[in-house]
Amino acid sequence: MDRIIGYMISPLLCKKISRGLSAGRVQSVAVKLVVERERKIKSFVSEEYYKLYAYLKNSKNLPLTLQVTHKKEKIFKPKNKNKIKLAIDILKKIDFFVINSFEKITFSKPSAPFTTATLQQAANVRLNYNIKKTMLLAQQLYEAGYITYMRTDSTHLSQDAINMAREYILKVFGKSYLSKKERKYTNKNNLQEAHEAIRPSYINIISEKKIKNLKLDAQNLYNLIFNQFIACQMMSAKYNFINITVKADNFKLHTSGRTLLFDGWIKIMPLLGQHYNDKILPILKIGEKLKLIKLIPNQCFTKPPVRYCEASLVKELEKKGIGRPSTYVSIITTIKNRGYVHTIDNRFYAKKIGEIVTDRLEESFNELISYDFTAKMENNLDLIAINQQYWKNVLNIFFKKFLQKLEIAKKDPKDGGMQLNKSVITDIDCSICKKKMMICTTSTGVFLGCSSYTMNIKEKCKNTINLIPKLEILNIIKNFNLKKDILLPQQYCHNCNTIMDCYIIYGQHNIFYICGKNPLCNGYKIKKSNLNHIITTKCKKCSYNMYLKQGCFGNYMLCINDTCKNTIKILSKSDIATL
């Protein structure tokens, strides 16, 4: 089914939008996730707000810090300085009393042993491996006999595996670290349970010496799998949790914290970042009066949604029931290769062609890239695999609707067919033939191309001008500590009031704004800029200026000194490489 969908829609996309494009039942949904997140980030407007912290002490002079969370039973989140100053003036004059104070013991259980998806996520977050690298290394470990099969949805462990893990814990860590009962993890419905969870094959046979003979990347992945396997049979981590609520007239203040009492499984699988959240707080009596030391306001700004990384994209696909362990690598590889998305610092950014393809599929094949439909179809395919559904019935129901929509999409846009990816004519003259340049969007990016190339004439002009996306420029000028909001302010289309995409015209360094609805809307703006003088650096060989250039391998800096011609590659992490 997936192959037929791809074979039928992909030629249509190539004809209507651009060459080299493809669509698929799962890959198109993955692109849609990235595009929707991209648009939320673009449309996000940061808002100022304030947090207010009160530094108090009790009768024994033990200090504690609480946040003012409520005023008159409503969340306290003032959006300007005047309101925060008014609150400070009131709080300075009133008393603080404890209205709630309790402590309790909490436990944190270990996660299940790895499935394919959770291994990909953990390796991405903990080891910074992309999922393609993770699966390649896992394949090598499996072929060498170090781990069990690495394509599985199951968290199930055999009894032999459980015994093996528990014997290791007892021997290495002692009885206090061994969970009192065997931990057995259940699976979701319709998952591929032909294999166990991913685990070391035989930890008693595979010595540390053998592991050390592996390449470092393979060692790290094996150790991650090993540690998670052992951790799943260890004792829970034990915390002392304390919660304190204080009242001051109409205001409520709150703080909480936990202290690690026993590490348990964390001993072998340490938490990342500040997840321990150790915060020692005094035990207070209800009704106890506290003394104010000081009040500190903290200016904050709301933040846009976080971009997907490979781990979070796989997690979101898994959460929505889309795709299977064996498909995640090919999905992400395909959407990158087609030019729909690209990654910077392991974060996904939607490219313009990805937005256009998503919009056209949404218009012509809305069911195909619906999250619910894709998950339901995935479930039906699983039922077919276990003979609970007849495959012809499932496919016939789908293809009857699909073929009808395909025939409509093939029609001319005037007759309700899929919209074309039209080029938008601009007022910019071609430097070669003096005809007008037009905005073009393909799988390789957005650029200006001469309009005579599309005319029915013998000598077609192939002149093009590259457009550098705002993101790439901001990455470069970070080296000069410039304020990006002054250099590249957000603009709205004068035709439809949509947020405009920002580019720099290569060679001119003028700012070029294109309507976010392009090519359906032909709105654009050109603004002069001094970026030509900003995007420079000194050559370390001859001290001449170096200017931004574009090559087939990306952006780089080139020395203008003809006798030097030194180049410096601009790294993906936005920094200019040092010689």
What are these regions (language model features)?
Residues A144-G145:
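Short glycine-/polar-rich loops that comprise or flank the Walker A/P-loop
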Residues F44-L66, N100-L137, L448, Y513:
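C-terminal accessory/connector segments of nucleic-acid motor ATPases
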Residues K93-K109, K294-C300:
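Positively charged, polyanion-binding regions of nucleic-acid-associated proteins
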Residues S18-S22, E103-A112, A122-L127, M150-Q159, ...:
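Conserved short loop/turn motifs at secondary-structure junctions
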